[in-house]
Amino acid sequence: LQLSDIADISELDSIFVSNVTISDTSGANLVFSCDLSGNQSKKTDDSSSCSSRSSDTDNESDDDEDDDEADGSSDDSGGSEDTDYSTASEDILIATINQFPVQVIAMEKCQDTLDSLIVESEEDLRDAEWGSMIIQVIMTLLAYQKCFSFTHNDLHTNNIMYIPTEKQYLYYKWDGKHYKVPTFGRLYKIIDFGRAIYKFRGNVVCSDSYHPKGDAATQYNFEPYFNDKKPRLEPNTSFDLCRLGCSLYDFVIDEIEENPKSPQNAAKRLIIEWCKDDKDRNILYKNNGDERYPDFKLYKMIARSVHKHSPSDVLNQGYFSRYIVGKKKIGKNAKIMNIDNLPDYS
């Protein structure tokens, strides 16, 4: 089943609700109550921890402060907690709700992450294998962008997984050209869309990670979390490949420095290029080896200063001409993933 095979998606209209009606709960029985005023969330700052190969941007210092406050409030309250809420522990009430809305994320079972593949492989990946991974990821991003004006916003080596396949080749059509891509036994998948931003039928779908108190606050500046005191900053289609390049940089840079012009490092040279900003500076490291933008500031600066690495621009580079074939050279029974014909749902 392909996205283009789905002609009627009218049932998805119910996802977006313009007028929300809150049911009358005046006659409901109170089962349990708790004063949460002493445990309000605190705003996270820009000093969040952020590894280039992960998206751990939780603010540890805020956690410490919350712990201290929790300890202090416990001392001040004395034994009031036991007396105020004793009925909650003594009288256990069970409510059976036959119909209750839930959110479910269903994921395909994959073999492992790209990070593990690179780190744990007994032999280094050949350049052609790097190229296969790169073009599969690019084609996936192109499909998402074509259908949903999509940006992932957290694409690193632990958010790409793969499954084994017996298919020797994948066939794509993009911008009128056909591509024949060797798989080397792996189909690569993008996962973890928690920070993704996309459009569906005129609606912008944006997670609360970008809320002023979210872990990705200030990466962009647009609705629904627009701050009119700062310049508008829309989602950046060059962000994903640059972010992926930053997570791959340390894996490939040694070989590039040893053999900068070797044909065996052609795909790796592409990855190094993705790590350059609009002024051709390495966005990850300074010349002295220090991080240019530590922690979450890397995300913010990629969004603001990198605009040359959108998937469509990258695919037009000479490296990918090796995959282009005439349609007549593709077997009649081959399944072509025609990105040109995918519908625009945005």
Give, region by region, the residue ranges found by the protein language model.
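Helical subdomain adjoining the active site within ATP-dependent kinase catalytic cores
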Residues: 30, 220-346
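Activation of the activation-loop gatekeeper triad in protein kinase-fold domains
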Residues: 166, 187-196
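Short coil/turn segments at secondary-structure boundaries
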Residues: 118-122, 156, 174, 201-206, ...
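Eukaryotic short linear interaction motifs
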Residues: 113-116, 163, 169-170, 196-200, ...
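Conserved structural core of kinase catalytic domains
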Residues: 1-128, 200-207
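Catalytic-loop of the protein kinase fold
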Residues: 145-181
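Conserved kinase catalytic-core helix
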Residues: 122-152, 166
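Acidic, Ser/Thr-rich intrinsically disordered and amphipathic helical segments
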Residues: 109, 113, 129-139, 143, ...
